[in-house]
Amino acid sequence: MTRNRRKSKTTATSHPELHLEKVDPMKTVTESMILFDVQLQEWVTKSAKNHEFVLSDKGIPASAYFLLGSFCSDGDIHVAYASKCPVHSSALEENATESSKMLEDEWMSDHAERLLRMLPGGIHVVGIAWFSDKKTFSDRKSHIHKTLGRIQKMNNQITTANVDDSISDNMITVFFETPSTTPIGAIIDVTNRGNDSAQKVQFQKLEWISLVTNASARIVHNVPVDTGRPTDFYSDLVVATKNFVNNLFQCEFTLLDGEIRDDKEPLIKDIKKNKKTTIEAQLFLNPLYNRELGAIDDIASNMHEVLFDIEVRAAVPIRSTVKDAIRAIKHHLVRNLFARVELHYESMEVVEEERSPKTGITVHQLPRPATTVLYTHPAILINDFLFEADNVEDAQKNFDDMMDLQTSIEHVDEGWERALTPEEMEAVRTPIEDLHFVDFDGSSDSWCTTKTILITIALIIGLLASIIYFTVAHS
């Protein structure tokens, strides 16, 4: 929930030469690997057949899937699930043009962003699987790489608010030259002109583990208003929460199951003997992160107050380090918050809450979560976000539409939070509306007068204290 108030006063290389090199036995060189969960073998077979059908029936030249998984601590990329990118509805029409059947980069990245909002911390859109003939893949490769670049950029924005560089720059493509089901993998450096390097794809039994905590905060920040620029809800919220997000990623104090652990330690020390499915975490932030060295009188012309109490359910590969586990928790918190802010901001084009006539305060209630587990990996909890009039059936439909999860109602949990009642919304406003707000007039010196009166009162109290002290001392 956020609320903002106006007009209040506050204080405040290597060379390509042929040579022999002696290998240091203590030095190991590892390469990143693309690992698909073994359960995805069935998906590959099914998807290849499905593409052959739509190719012959509708003439659709390619099928694309978003690969959901994790950037593992050892550099490998683990894939847990694949979600189909739909084609535009016009591609299914009887006389559809060839151009309408193509998956454009903007169309794909828009759908990837919707997926990102649903994923827990530690799980990302790590790449794209592509089913087509070889020529189509070659012709569309630049568009695929462009899409991956957009996805990485969006992931940075929604998961770290662009204040931390912890999102990997490497993403993957996995090409299936149908009807073959043999994967051809490549790792793409999206920050280096999309350069790619071939990489073998392997199927293994993969496992993730849950990281659980709760996070609540009250963030108060005055967002400076630029003259001539209308205030923007989303941009203002990014500015208002920037210090908090910075502090979150700089935080070094975390307990995992009640222990302080070294960042470089493996999260699970003995995987073969491990029986844990969940690890509880506690993060400790610097409470003075929003304090400045000097205090000056200022006028808060665009004050924002952000309140949240969020249940965190992140997930990481079981072979992760402590550092990456803690990072996933932070990613979850930021992504969960900003996913709601983005959805709310988009909905404001339809519904805009009226500003309080008394104080100019607007209260924004962000959508609440509904969740379901990824059936192949129960540690991965998928999120949907519901508005006040939405219900569990809406969440079930969204899970099916976006990820083809086909989840039953019984497996959708919307009990994490609830919408505030009208009475509770009024109670949120009340503490602020009880204050006396006065429009600031730059030509007026009333605030200076108030300051002078306070100084005078302080001097009088000081004099009285001195008189009493000397009277008692000499009596």
Swiss-Prot record:
Positions of transmembrane segments: 60-80, 453-473
Disruption phenotype: Failure to localize the diacetyl receptor odr-10.
Major place of residence: endoplasmic reticulum
Topology within the bilayer: Multi-pass membrane protein
Residues spanning the signal sequence: none
Tissue: Expressed in the amphid head neurons AWA, AWC, AWB, ADF, ADL, ASG, ASH, ASI, ASJ, and ASK, and in the phasmid tail neurons, PHA and PHB.
Entry keywords, A to Z: Cell projection, Chemotaxis, Cytoplasmic vesicle, Endoplasmic reticulum, Golgi apparatus, Membrane, Olfaction, Sensory transduction, Transmembrane, Transmembrane helix
Disulfide partners: none
GO biological process, one term: olfactory behavior
Subcellular localization, as worded in the UniProt entry: Endoplasmic reticulum membrane; Golgi apparatus membrane; Cytoplasmic vesicle, Secretory vesicle membrane; Cell projection, Dendrite
Domain of life: Eukaryota
A Pfam family reported for this protein in Swiss-Prot or TrEMBL: ODR4-like
GO cellular component, as recorded: axon; dendrite; endoplasmic reticulum membrane; Golgi membrane; intracellular membrane-bounded organelle; protein-containing complex; transport vesicle membrane
Subunit structure, as described in the record: Interacts with odr-8 and odr-10.
Function of the molecule: Required, with oct-8, for the localization of a subset of 7 transmembrane domain odorant receptors, including odr-10, to the cilia of olfactory neurons AWA and AWC. Regulates chemotaxis responses to benzaldehyde, diacetyl and 2,4,5-trimethylthiazole in AWA and AWC neurons. Plays a role in nociceptive neurons to mediate avoidance of high oxygen.
Similarity remark: Belongs to the ODR-4 family.
Name under which the protein is recorded: Odorant response abnormal protein 4
Gene: odr-4
